[in-house]
């Protein structure tokens, strides 16, 4: 299952293999957890948004479930996590890549990802709208609008 903000994103998610899409606008976490998991919650919640979505992830996970987050850059009350026995994994790939001590282990992984992308086995989701580097403010506004489906690309 994946949560999306509109039908266009739901279609894209299904094209990528999601077996169920949940339009979260106007639907509470409790509502979709009850509907799709018989009120048990999800074993694993993968959060790529962060912010308030991380709090929603705590709510969507089952007791003793796992949350994986790649975008946590804010402060959160972890009480719901502790009271439900959740495990939280926060991954900051940029920090790992930027650390010179990790270059020996990161380089082969990035090369493998590049190979998979070149062979068509890994298909990055890139939004149709691209921006020139001079238009970075417009690109950021577009990103913040929630409209993009995939990554927003800046070009020189």
Per-segment meaning from a language model:
Residues 1-52:
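Adenosine-nucleotide cofactor-binding segment
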Residues 61-62:
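Helix-to-beta-strand junctions that scaffold the AdoMet/dcAdoMet cofactor pocket
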Residues 80-128:
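C-terminal substrate-binding/catalytic core of Rossmann-like NAD(P)-dependent dehydrogenases/reductases
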Residues 119-125, 137-156:
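C-terminal capping/lid region of NAD(P)-dependent oxidoreductase domains
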